[in-house]
């Protein structure tokens, strides 16, 4: 069934489940109750794919970081796919996955907007003011980015960078997941040169 026109989002009340495309802007056009029905292909993939997933997001640097992680894993003999916002849709590789396959998943704020599952390893590089044309404001944008770690458990990992202008340190500290700041320099590398 096709719904068009200014009030096309009103039809969400007629369905139990709505699969949203990342480009559709919802903002505050529908109620919170109706938003609970919304999912996405990203959410479905994260919830139902049993493989290890390394998810990368941030305002800047997602593609570079995702590509580096992919190439490091690939060059070290791992069976790995680079998927997501970088160009290959996640479900395009589903029939190629083996038990040991690792997925490096570049995730935009739009892809994270309606997820209810975090990847096994979540990387949040940074958060700056962007994409505010899509969201009601910076808080809504940050809320989407935070979904990458919101559902982590004690067996998961969060690696994070420049995020504390918009996210409280206490929120990160209270996560049950293993945490590592990019600034921690656990290898004790001399970065002054």
Question: Positions of the model-derived regions?
Answer:
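General structural signal for secondary-structure boundaries
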Residues: 8, 40, 191-193
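Long, basic/Gly/Ser/Thr-rich N-terminal segments
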Residues: 1-9
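Phosphate-binding loop of NTP-binding sites
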Residues: 10-17, 22-157, 166-177
């Amino acid at each position: 069934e096709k719904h068009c026109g200014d009030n096309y989002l009103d039809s969400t009340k007629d369905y139990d489940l709505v699969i949203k495309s990342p480009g559709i802007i919802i903002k505050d056009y529908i109620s919170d109750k109706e938003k609970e029905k919304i999912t996405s292909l990203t959410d479905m993939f994260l919830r139902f794919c049993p493989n290890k997933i390394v998810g990368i997001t941030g305002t800047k640097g997602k593609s570079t970081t995702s590509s580096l992680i992919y190439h490091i894993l690939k060059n070290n003999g791992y069976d790995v796919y680079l998927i997501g916002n970088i160009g290959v849709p996640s479900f395009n590789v589903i029939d190629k996955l083996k038990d040991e396959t690792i997925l490096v998943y570049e995730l935009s704020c739009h892809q994270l907007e309606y997820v209810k599952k975090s990847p096994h390893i979540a990387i949040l590089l940074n958060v700056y003011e962007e994409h505010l044309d899509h969201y009601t404001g910076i808080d809504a944008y940050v809320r989407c980015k935070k979904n990458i770690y919101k559902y982590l458990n004690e067996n998961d990992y969060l690696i994070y960078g420049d995020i504390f202008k918009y996210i409280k340190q206490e929120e990160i500290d209270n996560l049950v997941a293993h945490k590592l700041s990019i600034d921690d320099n656990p290898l004790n590398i001399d970065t002054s040169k």
